[in-house]
């Protein structure tokens, strides 16, 4: 007899990613780690606040994917302080938003971003490390 863990539809295993659609500002917690967020800003600018350096846990990670083709408003992923280091490539192969040693506080999915552009973020050692890819020049930038 097969274990229910081997049955894809049993609900016992984690065969699928946990995906949520963000359309309004939200504050994420460590418990949201591992989720994939499809991001749209048709109604207003969206701010996504992550755990701070004092509340973040090592290994907490999130993925944000632009769902709306050329978002209506900016989507800002906020850290609360300059604790983010990012490696980024855009459509022209430029380093784009890469921090190159200068940490940042926010990453912005710009109104020029394309559906499928994404950012992966992980907390480690009191700071965030990020990887971002955009199919258009300057679709993702920092502040």
Give residue ranges: language-model regions.
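A short catalytic or substrate-binding loop motif that flags glycine-/basic-rich loops and adjacent residues
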Residues: 56, 111-113
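Exposed extracellular interaction/assembly regions and N-terminal maturation sites
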Residues: 1-96, 123-143
